[in-house]
Amino acid sequence: MRITNKEQLTAHGNREGRKIVAELLDAGLDALDPYVRVKQLVHVENGKIVLHTDGFEMKGDPHAGPLEFDLKDYDRVYVIGAAKGVQRAALAMEEALGDVLTGGHVIAKHGEDIICKKIGVTLAGHPVPDEACVEGCKKIEALARDITSRDLVFTITGSGCGSLMTYPADDITIDEIARFTHMMQIEKGVPTSDLNPIRTHIDRFKGGRLSRL
């Protein structure tokens, strides 16, 4: 139950109607929870990591069916990422993979409780990035530079990643990016979709650069 004041909400007015609406909202929140969805998607079966659930497939998709990674082909398994809800997905990966998981690092938003146990967590600034974003990126960078062709890396991204995974390019400071972001998004209301193309030119990770380390 995610609606913590359900009894209060359904104690007056059209009680039956309110109860139905509360249950619908609760079911919707469960369906959108990264933890719930990842636990449905990720499994370890017969020495393989299997990504599959019918709920994630589009009708007629030519690539339908499970995606499998044979563990004998990999020495280590990592999880990295950044998003406002990244810890829920990362925790699900921890539980689904169990001892198969080597470790990893994710960047989440300031104010969250740290719930991951095996995957490291940095709490950082959103929507305006801060120095903690850089520190989190450095930890991911160190991990990425140690990756070999015998390692399997799962990357979790989502809403907020553009800010949380901020790693300024050479000759640009985090303070400059913070001021730029505040001006564009907080003061001017520029959509994130318009800001992201600019970010690719001033960041060490964006534009696919992280995958090329």
Set out the residue ranges of the language-model regions.
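N-terminal loops that bind phosphate or other acidic moieties
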Residues: M1-T157, C161-L213
